[in-house]
Design a protein with these regions (language model features):
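Short amphipathic alpha-helix that is part of the acyltransferase structural core
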Residues: 2-33, 241-243, 249-294
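Acyl-donor-binding surface of acyltransferase catalytic domains
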Residues: 34-272, 427-434
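Glycine-rich acetyl-CoA-binding "A-motif" of GNAT/NAT acetyltransferases
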Residues: 63-65, 329-334, 396
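Conserved acetyl-CoA-binding loop-helix of GNAT-fold acetyltransferases
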Residues: 117-138, 355-372, 376-380, 413, ...
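Conserved GNAT acetyl-CoA-binding A-motif
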Residues: 141-146, 151-154, 170-186, 370-405
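Conserved active-site alpha-helix within GNAT-family acetyltransferase domains
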Residues: 189-206, 374-397, 401-424
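A conserved beta-strand-loop-helix scaffold within acyl/acetyltransferase catalytic domains
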Residues: 292-312, 318-352
C-alpha cells in the first residue's frame, strides 16, 4: 500500500479552519491554541499557521494522525515554533505513582500508539521542518534580525537597580539558537522523541539522519493544568465576580471590583492606581529571568504586579524610574504574566518578600485577569464545518497551564498547592536540519 505524500498547508484564517479542531483536543492542544489566539490579537506579518491538512470544510480523518503549528522565525531568540500532533492526546500520562512532586517521569507515545501511527507522525514532523527550512527560513536569514539575534544578544543586566535574584548578580540569558536552527517551545516529549534514532528514548543522544538537536531540556518540564476553579474568586452571591464592566475591559489600568487578597501592606496597583505591569517595569522584569523577552513581547503579555508599603519603608526600587530619576515611579516587588502561549510565566517574588504567599496570590490573579471575559484568550470563532458560532465549552476558554522543570521540587509543590494538575512532560528544543 502506497503511503500518501505529506503536504504542508497554510491556514490564513485559523480562527475558522483550525481553532475548533484544537478545542476538541483540549487540554492537550492548549499551548498551540493559546499561541494562535495571541497571534490573532497581535498579528505578525512574518507569522504562519501550518498544518498537514488543508484549510477546508473537511476535517482530518479521526484515524490518520495530523499535525499543526504556529511559526514565526522572526522572533529570533524567543520561541519561534509551537507545534501540536494529534497523537499527543493518545500519549502516556504519568502513572499514579508519578503524579506528585517526588517522582520523575517522561511522557512518551509508548506502546499505546501503533508503530505505524508513530512512523507517520515522524514523517509529518520531518516534512514540516523541511517545509519551514525551504519556504520560511530564507526570508528570515536575509533579514537584519537574524544576524542581530545571533551576534548581538541582549544584555543580561539592564540598568535597573538590584539586578539578578536580589543579589546584584545579573541573570545569564539562555544563548540564542543558530540562525539556521529552530527554537520549538512546549514540545511534547513524545513528539520530540520521534527525532531520536531510537524513537522511544527521550534521552537518546543519537538523532535521525539529517537532524541535529542542538539543545533540549533533559530532564524535561512538567506541564501543569489549571482549571478555572484553581484561580477564580469565591462567589459573594452579589454579582458576577469574574467579569469586568464594559468600561474596564479595554482599560488595563482600571481597578476591578474584586481581586485575590494579598497580605496586609501589599496591593495590586501602584500609588497612581494603575493595575498591571507598566512599560517602565520591563527592564526590572527582564533582569530577573534567564529567558530573553523583548519589551515589545512583555507589553503584549497580560501581566500583574504587586507593590509593597506595609512597613512605610520604600522598597529598594520604589524610588527609581526606568531612567534613573528619583521619586516618580514605583517599582513592584512581585509579578506574573501569561505568555504568548497562555502559560503562567515569568513568576517572580523579590527575596525579601518570599514565604508570605505572595507568589500564589499573584499567580492566581494573573490567570484570573488574563482569562477574563473579552480577553485575548477568550475569543470565539466561527466553525466552517458546523456553519455556526463555535466557542469554548464551560471552563475551556479559561484553562490555564504552566511548565516547571521536573527536578524543581519547590516550584512543583507551589503549582500543586495552587491546584495544578499534572498533564504531561514537554521541552524546549533547538533543532536544525542538515544539508
Amino acid at each position: 500500500m502506497t503511503t500518501p505524500e505529506i503536504l504542508i498547508y497554510h491556514h490564513p484564517d485559523p480562527q475558522s479552519s483550525l481553532l475548533p479542531l484544537l478545542r476538541a483536543h483540549l487540554p492537550h492542544s492548549v499551548p498551540l491554541l493559546r499561541r494562535i489566539q495571541h497571534g490573532l490579537a497581535y498579528p505578525s506579518p512574518t507569522a504562519a499557521v501550518l498544518a498537514t491538512f488543508p484549510a477546508t470544510t473537511t476535517l482530518p480523518s479521526t484515524t490518520e494522525p495530523w499535525l499543526a503549528a504556529h511559526v514565526d522565525l522572526f522572533r529570533g531568540r524567543e520561541t519561534q515554533i509551537y507545534i501540536y500532533s494529534s497523537l499527543e492526546r493518545e500519549a502516556s500520562s504519568p502513572p499514579a505513582s508519578a503524579a506528585g512532586v517526588d517522582s520523575d517521569f517522561v511522557s512518551t507515545f509508548g506502546d499505546r500508539i501503533s508503530m505505524d501511527k508513530q512512523a507517520r507522525t515522524r514523517d509529518q514532523l520531518l516534512a514540516f521542518l523541511a517545509y519551514v527550512k525551504a519556504n520560511l527560513l530564507p526570508e528570515y536569514l536575509s533579514s537584519p534580525k537574524a544576524a542581530a539575534a545571533a551576534d548581538n544578544p541582549p544584555s543580561p543586566s539592564p540598568s535597573t537597580p538590584g539586578t539578578g535574584s536580589g543579589t546584584g548578580t545579573p541573570v545569564k540569558k539562555i544563548p540564542p539558537p543558530p540562525p539556521t536552527a529552530f527554537l520549538i517551545g512546549s514540545m511534547h516529549t513524545g513528539l520530540a522523541t520521534l527525532l531520536t534514532a531510537s524513537g522511544t528514548d527521550y534521552s537518546d543522544p543519537q538523532t535521525l539522519p539529517g537532524v541535529r538537536i542542538i539543545r533540549r531540556d533533559d530532564p524535561p518540564y512538567v506541564k501543569y493544568l489549571f482549571r478555572p476553579e484553581a484561580y477564580r474568586l469565591p462567589s459573594t452571591g452579589t454579582d458576577n465576580d469574574n467579569t469586568t464592566s464594559d468600561k474596564d475591559k479595554d482599560r488595563d489600568e482600571a481597578p476591578e471590583r474584586r481581586r485575590h487578597p494579598l497580605p496586609p501592606g501589599y496591593r495590586f496597583h501602584d500609588r497612581r492606581g494603575r493595575y498591571g505591569v507598566q512599560p517602565h517595569h520591563h527592564a526590572l522584569v527582564s533582569s530577573r529571568t534567564h529567558i530573553p523577552r523583548s519589551s515589545e513581547t512583555l507589553a503584549r503579555m497580560p501581566g500583574v504586579a504587586v507593590y509593597y508599603d506595609g512597613d512605610d519603608k520604600p522598597n529598594p526600587n520604589s524610588s527609581q524610574t526606568h531612567d534613573g530619576l528619583e521619586g516618580e515611579e514605583e517599582m513592584p516587588i512581585a509579578w506574573a504574566f501569561l505568555g504568548v502561549d497562555g502559560s503562567l510565566a515569568t513568576l517572580h517574588v523579590e527575596p525579601a518578600h518570599r514565604g508570605r504567599g505572595i507568589g500564589a496570590c499573584v499567580s492566581r490573579e494573573a490567570m484570573r485577569s488574563g482569562f477574563r471575559a473579552g480577553g485575548i484568550f477568550r475569543s470565539r470563532s466561527r466553525s466552517r464545518s458546523l456553519g455556526e458560532e463555535e466557542g469554548e465549552g464551560e471552563g475551556e476558554g479559561e484553562l490555564g497551564h504552566t511548565d516547571v522543570l521536573v527536578t524543581n521540587r519547590a516550584s512543583r509543590r507551589v503549582m500543586e498547592k495552587l491546584g495544578g494538575e499534572i498533564g504531561w512532560t514537554d521541552t524546549w528544543v533547538v533543532v536544525e536540519l542538515e544539508g
